[in-house]
């Protein structure tokens, strides 16, 4: 249980990644830069860790947002809460330099969302929920595969509303053909099975359909894998 590990005073759980000790770990910061370190060089879980800033050199004011581990050809969704994203291979996330490299261009006022693993670029779908209670589900195949950039528009949100933090993508997940998607709103949750999700299918770049009352202030989503 990573959230139950021992942390230094003032520290708390942020993100975790599962992998093997002979693999590199990729870290993504708030400016869209990525950094990679050999997993076996990181401190063991018996201690309280060490600052990442001692191993890599992020820009001033940047904060680390996520960590991922995978195989070179594994596909991931890179996106921002401005509603833009693209597909990238794990090998293209890795950076040899201490200063890392820019992979994701972040629009003004937008925030980086955690990379999401894609099992099948042909069959999987992307589910986005906005802070205004709209859900949009469309095929991963409608997004380009890139090594860096801003990506394509996934959900229609005016840039000015993102910059003012009035409207933005609250969360994004990748769902398989038979997967179920659970939405969390306060103490309530709503599970949408594969058939239920069809109501929210739409073309990439649309606004999405309104969720039922009581579930229009979604905090987060999770995927229940089937098969």
Task: Give the positions of each predicted feature.
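Short, structured "edge-of-domain" segments at secondary-structure transitions
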Residues: 1-227
